[in-house]
């Protein structure tokens, strides 16, 4: 009985997959882009529906975007997977209604309907634009289907397996990168390695291949790395101090406490 409640219904799962494919394939420069809060909600519902409650530790202070995402996911508590899928679909309906209300239909290209078509096929109560717009788009779609089948673009990111991904097959960071377009991909590129972190802390450093990490060719390509620069400055000041000690007459005429101490030791 418990497993039946936990497993989502087939219709709900199909609607969820269609909504995920639409969000992941929204054009970057299209007429509408979800807001920051909407992307966080989509991300949290997606993680809850595919992985369950948030059990991973919160990211560090150096990853503010990761902390926002973690807070949104963790705020869902013990919400079931089916409830998370339903919430994702409901949020998708609100977004569709917002697009219809705010974006002028004259600015929406006809091929834009290809991104939203999966929703109208599986979600009966999906908000729809005016009938005049639907008739124009439906006629375009029928011409494509009857003429050239290859012109019909299938959803590129539609999940092939309805089962949620297992934690053993992907690490949490890999999962975040896979579904990043559900939330914050366009706002903050993910730092996948310490090398990228060093480049973000030190602007202007050129990226180096792993095998040339130590040499790096910084003298020819650009500014030196942080470590090499500090060591070079240290050597410069050390040599300057040596020259100053050799050429300074005051140093020779006025021996310091160390010279007096060595002289007294020799006399004793």
Curated annotation (Swiss-Prot):
The modification Phosphoserine is found at residues 166, 171. InterPro entries: Acyl-CoA-binding_prot_CS (IPR022408), Acyl-CoA-binding_protein (IPR000582), Acyl-CoA-binding_sf (IPR035984), FERM/acyl-CoA-bd_prot_sf (IPR014352). An acyl-CoA binds at residues 23-32, 43-47, 69, 88. One of its GO terms (biological process) is fatty acid metabolic process. Residues 156-167 have a biased composition (Pro residues). CDD domains: ACBP (cd00435). Residues 12-101 form the ACB domain. Disulfide bonds: none annotated. GO terms for molecular function: fatty-acyl-CoA binding. The keyword Cytoplasm does not apply. Keywords: Lipid-binding, Phosphoprotein. Pfam families: ACBP. It comes from the Eukaryota. Residues 151-175 are annotated as: Disordered. One of its GO terms (cellular component) is cytoplasm. Binds medium- and long-chain acyl-CoA esters and may function as an intracellular carrier of acyl-CoA esters. This is Acyl-CoA-binding domain-containing protein 4. It comes from Homo sapiens (Human). The lineage of its organism: Eukaryota, Metazoa, Chordata, Craniata, Vertebrata.
């Amino acid at each position: 009985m418990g497993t039946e409640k936990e497993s989502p219904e087939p219709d709900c799962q199909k609607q969820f997959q269609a909504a995920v494919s639409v969000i992941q394939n929204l054009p970057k420069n299209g007429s509408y882009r979800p807001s920051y809060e909407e992307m966080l909600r989509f991300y949290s519902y997606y993680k809850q529906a595919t992985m369950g409650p948030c059990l991973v530790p919160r990211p560090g202070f150096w990853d503010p975007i990761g902390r926002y995402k973690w807070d949104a996911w963790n705020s869902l508590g013990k919400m079931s997977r089916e409830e998370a899928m339903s919430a994702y679909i409901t949020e998708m309906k609100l977004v569709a209604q917002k697009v219809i209300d705010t974006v002028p239909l004259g600015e929406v290209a006809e091929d834009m309907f290809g991104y939203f078509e999966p929703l109208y096929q599986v979600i009966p109560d999906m908000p729809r634009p005016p009938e005049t717009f639907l008739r124009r788009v439906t006629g375009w779609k029928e011409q494509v289907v009857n003429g050239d089948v290859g012109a019909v673009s299938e959803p590129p990111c539609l999940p092939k397996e309805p089962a949620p991904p297992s934690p053993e097959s992907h690490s949490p960071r890999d999962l975040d990168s896979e579904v990043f377009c559900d939330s914050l991909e366009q706002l903050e590129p993910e730092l996948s390695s310490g090398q990228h972190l060093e480049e973000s802390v030190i602007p202007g450093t050129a990226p180096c291949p792993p095998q040339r990490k130590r040499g790096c060719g910084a003298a020819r390509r650009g500014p030196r790395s942080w470590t090499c620069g500090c060591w070079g400055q240290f050597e410069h000041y050390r040599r300057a101090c040596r020259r100053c000690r050799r050429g300074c007459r005051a140093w020779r005429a006025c021996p310091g406490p160390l010279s007096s101490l060595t002289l007294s030791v020799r006399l004793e």
